[in-house]
């Protein structure tokens, strides 16, 4: 790949802050735009129907499964390519990129089939209102069957980022989000000869935006290797990417479990949880952006045996993230009613959401210290300890405690 030399120049820069401030802003902007997909959908759907807003909250964990598979595979591709660039193996990096695209298509086919079969049984466990169930099944099937764009864009963006190109993924995210923003009100409420599709329209707008983003990043498409070699590359990709997939899957299982617990109280409680996680994705952009950026940098420097630089990159990234997360803490503590009011003015939603947001906002600062270190282990191919910690924290502690408090409080 022609940009391998530029990758070496960027990642060899002595000033770590200069590296981060060069490559992080485009990635953070891309993630900001990505976060806008769900926020924009929730904004317009919330004005269409309260049950529609509940439906989006129920389907949010399903969308996280897509993200876990797509981004986790992309992380494996990104890490493997970064190591190959560090060792001057450009052709091998190209074969890795080709394997990633093939894995994206295979993952999409499997996920689309399974989600279509099990969508209704899942939704029935997380929503009470028949209208909310109907909306959730409709929206969920549209975004899952149409998720090929997510898989391809995630892989191709990581290919570009491994080569030091952070701008094209940013452009793709911006274009996709603008497409979604333009189509959402038109397809939800109708315009001229275009009929109002309601919640289904939000699903179609989301899929259209994702397809546009995938097309823009498609210059990263490479020919996959032959079948035997493809399976070998796939094992290497998933060996590096499975920690990311597994940790995001744990997060998804955690949210699904909370939805099921809260559904026993009211659909409004499920709605509040969905709104929180969508707003959280906005305030966590600096943290998530730095996590994305430091993976190839850490992988490159670790391959070059620059261990002190790896530690310094991790420490500096934690410091930057802590400063940015203070904005989220202040917002959730001081203006929770305004944050929720962007999507819903229903008294029941506000009554549940305002105190909940103030409690949860206190967790933003410690979140940095728990979420950043696992990235280091992932980048160097030693993610076992972080995986164990994630299982204990989310599955063994948080879910049982949530269930217990729901019965006693």
Q: What are the residue ranges of the model-derived segments?
A:
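Transmembrane helical elements of multi-pass membrane transporters/channels
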Residues: 22-41, 142, 153, 176, ...
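Helix-terminus/linker motif at the lipid-water interface of multi-pass membrane proteins
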Residues: 32, 36-54, 123-130, 186-197, ...
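Small-residue hotspots at the loop-to-helix junctions and early N-terminal turns
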Residues: 50-61, 136, 140, 203, ...
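Helix-loop-helix hairpin linking two adjacent transmembrane segments in secondary transporters
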Residues: 145-149, 153, 157-161, 167-214
């Amino acid at each position: 790949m022609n940009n391998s030399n530029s990758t070496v120049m960027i990642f060899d820069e002595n000033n770590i802050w200069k590296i981060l401030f060069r490559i992080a802003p485009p990635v953070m902007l891309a993630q900001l735009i990505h976060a806008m997909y769900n926020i924009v959908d929730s904004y317009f759907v919330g004005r269409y129907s309260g049950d529609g807003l509940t439906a989006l909250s129920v389907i949010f964990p399903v969308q996280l499964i897509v993200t876990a598979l797509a981004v986790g595979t992309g992380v494996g591709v990104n890490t493997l390519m970064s190591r190959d660039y560090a060792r001057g193996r450009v052709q091998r990096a190209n074969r890795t990129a080709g394997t990633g695209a093939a894995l994206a298509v295979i993952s999409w086919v499997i996920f689309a089939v399974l989600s279509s079969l099990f969508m209704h049984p899942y939704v029935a466990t997380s929503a009470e209102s028949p209208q909310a169930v109907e909306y959730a099944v409709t929206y969920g099937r549209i975004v899952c069957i149409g998720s090929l764009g997510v898989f391809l864009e995630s892989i191709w963006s990581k290919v570009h980022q491994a080569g030091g190109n952070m701008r094209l993924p940013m452009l793709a995210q911006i274009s996709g989000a603008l497409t979604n923003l333009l189509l959402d009100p038109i397809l939800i409420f109708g315009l001229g000869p275009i009929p109002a599709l309601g919640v289904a329209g939000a699903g179609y707008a989301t899929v259209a935006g994702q397809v546009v983003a995938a097309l823009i990043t498609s210059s990263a498409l490479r020919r996959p290797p032959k079948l035997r070699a493809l399976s070998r590359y796939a094992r290497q990709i998933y060996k590096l990417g499975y920690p990311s997939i597994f940790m995001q899957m744990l997060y998804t299982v955690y949210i699904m479990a909370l939805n099921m617990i809260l559904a026993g109280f009211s659909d409004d409680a499920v709605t509040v949880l969905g709104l929180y996680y969508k707003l959280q994705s906005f305030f966590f952009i600096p943290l998530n952006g730095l996590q994305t950026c430091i993976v190839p940098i850490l992988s490159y420097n670790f391959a070059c045996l620059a261990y002190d630089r790896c530690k310094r990159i991790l420490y500096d990234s934690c410091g930057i993230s802590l400063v940015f997360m203070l904005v989220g803490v202040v917002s959730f503590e001081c203006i929770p009613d305004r944050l929720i009011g962007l999507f819903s003015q229903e008294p029941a939603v506000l009554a549940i959401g305002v105190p909940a947001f103030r409690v949860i906002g206190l967790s933003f600062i410690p979140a940095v210290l728990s979420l950043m270190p696992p990235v280091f282990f992932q980048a160097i191919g030693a993610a076992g300890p972080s995986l164990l910690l994630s299982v204990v924290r989310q599955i063994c502690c948080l879910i049982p405690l949530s269930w217990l408090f729901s019965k006693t409080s």
